Swiss-Prot record:
Its EC number is 6.3.5.5. This is Carbamoyl phosphate synthase small chain. Transmembrane segments: none annotated. Small subunit of the glutamine-dependent carbamoyl phosphate synthetase (CPSase). CPSase catalyzes the formation of carbamoyl phosphate from the ammonia moiety of glutamine, carbonate, and phosphate donated by ATP, constituting the first step of 2 biosynthetic pathways, one leading to arginine and/or urea and the other to pyrimidine nucleotides. The small subunit (glutamine amidotransferase) binds and cleaves glutamine to supply the large subunit with the substrate ammonia. The lineage of its organism: Bacteria, Pseudomonadati, Campylobacterota, Epsilonproteobacteria, Campylobacterales. L-glutamine binds at S45, G240, G242, L269, Q272, N310, Y313.
Length: 372
């Protein structure tokens, strides 16, 4: 199956396609991870984006039932240099081709991804249309111009749960080939789901929390009431997709939670929403940070952690007026983590659940528990 690709900078490409046929729109971002493609593809934070893998060959270990970060795939599609013609892993259940087709997503291969990565690095993230139906450049250009801009779409309401649920499994136990059972806990955390990854919930359970997940539009007053009754001891603000500044109501609710002095931890989008709630607007980066090899310095311990990253937006330096900066990214020197002054709130831009990625930042979940 052949596919045609048109980028907003007037670049027109063709390649081979697999998975779902059709016409797809999104923003190109590149990811530098060498492994963990299933976790990356199933991360809800990629909603509305085409993932360009810098790793030359993808698909060699297939896919399995336990490495998904969500039940659905919200990314617009996946682009790679080479697609592995076979897969081999004792946990694998199906090929990447079958996996994408089952989830209704397109995959692109036999494409010069090094060229694309350099283009994104030099020009910033680019809007794109990929089609197996339209082969004419001008028709694709018109279609892209008519499509919605990613910064104007509220993807959070698409990826969030529609109703409350309890999460009762811990992390994957490789020795026993199953997820750990939930521990008995005296501390309960309310997770606001802006697009939460399954392994973040697993880590919260593993560290000793009872976990209840709420939709993105849960009201602060409901959670404040639960906190005052002692039915929850903290609130977790999850990762998620899209432009944080358009989430006006969610930011207002977080401001109420902060004013109530409820212990909170924010990761990725949650980190950005907290900054906006305190009056310090986030900004869009040129091409973001996506990968599992990003060095971050912990300014409190003077140690360097290798972290997993997936974001296009960042908090401003001015946030230091209300928060102590705890972490910095050594690739870009941007703010990576903060501890708010006079509030029991911490947040980080990177992903301490490390799925996929290094395990060096998992202590942050214990720091969250220590706030309570």
């Amino acid at each position: 199956m052949k596919a045609y690709i048109y980028l907003e900078n007037d670049i027109f490409l063709s390649a081979k396609a697999f998975g779902k046929s059709g016409t797809f729109f999104g923003e190109l971002v590149f990811n530098t991870s060498l492994t963990g493609y299933q976790e990356i593809i199933s991360d809800p934070s990629y909603a509305g984006q085409f993932i360009v893998f810098s790793m030359p060959e993808i698909g060699i270990v297939g896919t399995n039932e336990n490495d998904n970060e969500s039940k659905e795939i919200f990314a617009s599609g996946v682009l790679m240099r080479e697609l592995s013609s076979s897969f081999s892993n004792f946990r694998a259940k199906e090929s990447l081709q079958d996996y994408l087709e089952k989830h209704g997503k397109i995959g692109i291969y036999e494409l010069d991804t090094r060229y694309l990565v350099k283009m994104i690095r030099n020009n910033g993230n680019l809007r794109a249309v990929i089609s197996t139906e339209i082969s004419n450049k001008e028709d694709l250009k018109i279609a892209l111009e008519k499509s919605a801009k990613i910064d104007e779409v509220n993807f959070v309401k698409e990826v969030s749960t529609k109703k409350n649920y309890s999460h009762k499994q811990g992390v994957w136990n490789a020795s026993f080939q199953k997820f750990n059972d939930a521990k008995r806990s005296e501390k309960k955390v309310a997770v606001i789901d802006y697009g939460v990854k399954t392994n973040i919930l697993n880590e919260l359970v593993e560290v000793g929390f009872e976990v209840e997940v709420y939709p993105y539009n849960v009201k602060a007053d409901e959670l404040i009431t639960l906190y005052k009754k002692g039915e929850i001891q903290g609130v977790f603000l999850s990762n998620g997709p899209g432009e944080p500044r358009i989430l006006k109501q969610e930011i207002a609710e977080i401001k109420k939670l902060a004013e109530a002095k409820i212990p909170m931890l924010g990761i990725c989008l949650g980190h950005q929403l907290l900054s906006n709630a305190f009056g310090y607007e986030t900004y869009k980066m040129k091409f973001g940070q996506h990968g599992a090899n990003h060095p971050v310095i912990n300014l409190d311990t003077k140690t360097v952690e290798i972290t997993a990253q997936n974001h296009n937006y960042n908090v401003p330096e001015e946030l230091a007026q209300v928060a102590h900066i705890t972490h910095r990214n050594l690739f870009g020197d941007n703010v990576e983590g903060v501890r708010y002054k006079d509030y029991p709130i911490i947040s980080v831009q990177h992903h301490p659940e490390s799925s996929s990625g290094p395990h060096e930042s998992k202590y942050i979940f214990k720091e969250f528990m220590n706030l309570m």
